């Protein structure tokens, strides 16, 4: 089930209410850093697993 435009809008409004307009850039920055770190860890893990398979 995909999110429609109204659901995305509602989620953004709830986030804005919870964190306020002043903190929103900081929250989004931290979220972006977290996603970037997750992608890097997944990439590193994939590289490590392929190296382990090649050593067999």
From Swiss-Prot:
It comes from Ehrlichia ruminantium (strain Welgevonden). It is found in: Cell inner membrane. InterPro entries: TatA/B/E, TatA/E. Belongs to the TatA/E family. The keyword Protein transport applies. It is a single-pass membrane protein. GO terms for molecular function: protein transmembrane transporter activity. The keyword Transport applies. GO terms for cellular component: TAT protein transport complex. This is Sec-independent protein translocase protein TatA.
């Amino acid at each position: 089930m995909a999110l429609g435009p109204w659901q995305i809008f509602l989620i953004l409004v709830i986030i804005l209410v919870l964190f306020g307009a002043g903190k929103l850039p900081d929250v989004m920055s931290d979220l972006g850093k977290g996603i970037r770190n997750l992608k890097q860890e997944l990439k590193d893990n994939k590289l490590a697993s392929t190296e382990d398979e090649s050593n067999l």
